[in-house]
Amino acid sequence: MSGENRAVVPIESNPEVFTNFAHKLGLKNEWAYFDIYSLTEPELLAFLPRPVKAIVLLFPINEDRKSSTSQQITSSYDVIWFKQSVKNACGLYAILHSLSNNQSLLEPGSDLDNFLKSQSDTSSSKNRFDDVTTDQFVLNVIKENVQTFSTGQSEAPEATADTNLHYITYVEENGGIFELDGRNLSGPLYLGKSDPTATDLIEQELVRVRVASYMENANEEDVLNFAMLGLGPNWE
């Protein structure tokens, strides 16, 4: 992938597509992605696989979002963050953020497991994966899985197409809740301390409030463009 053509087809917000890609990277078969239709309605939450280990949000970017990407972590938590270096690859980075911060879900010796272990002594104290080695790893993943990007139920756009839809990830790490966005050059965003009474990530009020803020700030025509995926036990 040349410097002039560092772009991929955007991944469809589809649990099967995300799960297939994650399994290729090393996610154990006992875990999978699934649709989340609400963070607050009990009747919809009751049918979700639990515990939820990560939440991926697809949302339309507006001017408010563009101006808020300078926020950064203000704590020493060991959350892992990848800088996005490939256009339209935010779905892949959402998967990387989900899995890298839940390494117990990875098969030992898998591609991502091996990469993270190889970097454990060389990455910075803030676990910022934004170096040349990381970039090459991501490019290799894309090369080996190029067909996966265009799978799904909808017609795939061109890799170089401009889109206003973007994926970010929420995880809990060492008692903190984080928003991970590869395009936020300041790194991971620390939302605050996790609620110790919550059974998993989907019950964390900080996540609910943050997602709600995106929906409230969206233009009326963009409200239907939101989607959420959760990472949890594979019920199939």
Curated annotation (Swiss-Prot):
Tell me where on the tree of life, at the top rank, the source sits: Eukaryota
The stretch of residues making up the signal peptide is: none
Keyword Hydrolase tagged: yes
Enzyme Commission number(s) of this protein: 3.4.19.12
The relationship between pH and activity is given as: Optimum pH is 8.5. Inactive at a pH below 6.5.
Q: Where is this site: Important for enzyme activity?
A: D181
- Show the GO MF annotations: cysteine-type deubiquitinase activity
- The kind of enzyme this is, by top-level EC class, is hydrolase
> Site Transition state stabilizer: which residues?
Q84
Q: Which UniProt keywords apply?
A: Hydrolase, Protease, Thiol protease, Ubl conjugation pathway
Which residues does the UniProt record annotate as the domain UCH catalytic?
Answer: 7-233
Task: Tell me the segments the record calls region Interaction with ubiquitin.
Answer: 10-15, 149-157, 219-228
By its UniProt entry, which InterPro entries does this protein fall under?
Papain-like_cys_pep_sf, Peptidase_C12_UCH, Peptidase_C12_UCH_sf, UCH_AS
Which Gene Ontology BP annotations are present?
protein catabolic process; ubiquitin recycling; ubiquitin-dependent protein catabolic process
Q: How is the activity affected by temperature?
A: Optimum temperature is 27 degrees Celsius.
Q: State the GO CC annotations.
A: cytoplasm
Q: Name one Pfam family in it.
A: Peptidase_C12
User: What is the reaction catalyzed?
Assistant: Thiol-dependent hydrolysis of ester, thioester, amide, peptide and isopeptide bonds formed by the C-terminal Gly of ubiquitin (a 76-residue protein attached to proteins as an intracellular targeting signal)
* Catalytic residue positions: C90, H166
> What role does this protein play?
Deubiquitinating enzyme (DUB) that controls levels of cellular ubiquitin through processing of ubiquitin precursors and ubiquitinated proteins. Thiol protease that recognizes and hydrolyzes a peptide bond at the C-terminal glycine of either ubiquitin or RUB1. Preferentially cleaves ubiquitin from peptides and small adducts.
According to its UniProt record, which protein family does this protein belong to?
A: Belongs to the peptidase C12 family.
The miscellaneous comment for this protein is: Can hydrolyze human UBB(+1), a mutated form of ubiquitin which is not effectively degraded by the proteasome and is associated with neurogenerative disorders. It can do so despite of the fact that the C-terminal 'Gly-76' of ubiquitin has been substituted for a tyrosine in UBB(+1).
The protein's name = Ubiquitin carboxyl-terminal hydrolase YUH1
What organism does the UniProt record list as the source?
A: Saccharomyces cerevisiae (strain ATCC 204508 / S288c)
